[in-house]
Amino acid sequence: MPYVTVGQENSATIDIYYEDLGAGQPIVLIHGFPLNGDSWEKQVLVLLNAGYRVITYDRRGFGASSQPSSGYDYDTFAADLHTLMTKLDLQNTVLVGFSMGTGEVTRYLGKYGSERVQKAVLMAPVPPFLLKTNDNPEGVDQSVFDGIMKAIVDDRPAYFSAFFKEFFNVDVLLGERISNEAIQASWNVAAGASAKGTLDCVPSWLTDFRDDLPRIDVPTLIIHGDADRILPLESTAARLPKRIKNSQLEIIPGGPHAINWTHADQVNPLLLNFLQ
């Protein structure tokens, strides 16, 4: 199993698990919370068939990567991505983030620039800024995130069960675009994640990306479902085209948060067309 070492805690190294498949222009897929690189299954198959080199990796604390007690912030997440990009010497890369993974894409480009990056894709994005403040009235009250953290501490497995119902819009899409088996598979991955990492990721969602967005200087595709209950369109993606030059927003009608799974039949053609 391939790993890249990104740090050390006490006597143990902090290692990021990745998969590097195929040949051609590199596409780096960055997963959402609380999943791992396997959540890109429906995109990996299509991208490999289209002749791309596809790299997935597990964020620290999740999947097969190390589960350290710290580093669950976007400066560290972006540094982990930078280490991977440097080790693999990726050039002309397309960075594709889903949900929490869009934070890595945004902070990476804001901090490290686009020397290694040709294009970017933000699916169901976290940016620009989730927290409601005086200068960000479109955000969400802090009390909502406090409630999430309490639910994780009280009963993390039960929190995941409730989370995935809204993640996939189960009440509407079960049996049509999502199966019980797929939901259970996602729950299993989430349950295996770091308890500390799961909790510490919540404050990271409140990162203010507004200064990073104008620094994105590559063509950027934004995709969002108009029925997203986790990150509503109006608070997130709808605010990005004015902040990212050379960007385009594509809206998936009826799409929940997990559009890369439930609406892969619509997401994948948009992705392939943008890559060409």
Swiss-Prot record:
TM segment ranges: none
GO MF annotation list: chloride peroxidase activity
UniProt-listed Pfam families: Abhydrolase_1 (PF00561)
Annotated Gene3D superfamilies: alpha/beta hydrolase (3.40.50.1820)
EC number(s) given by UniProt: 1.11.1.-
Keywords: Chloride, Oxidoreductase, Peroxidase
Catalytic site: 99, 228, 257
InterPro entries assigned to the protein according to its UniProt record, in alphabetical order: AB_hydrolase, AB_hydrolase_1, AB_hydrolase_fold, Epox_hydrolase-like
Recorded superkingdom: Bacteria
Domain AB hydrolase-1: 26-263
Entry similarity comment: Belongs to the AB hydrolase superfamily. Bacterial non-heme haloperoxidase / perhydrolase family.
Stated name of the protein: Putative non-heme chloroperoxidase
Gene source species: Synechocystis sp. (strain ATCC 27184 / PCC 6803 / Kazusa)
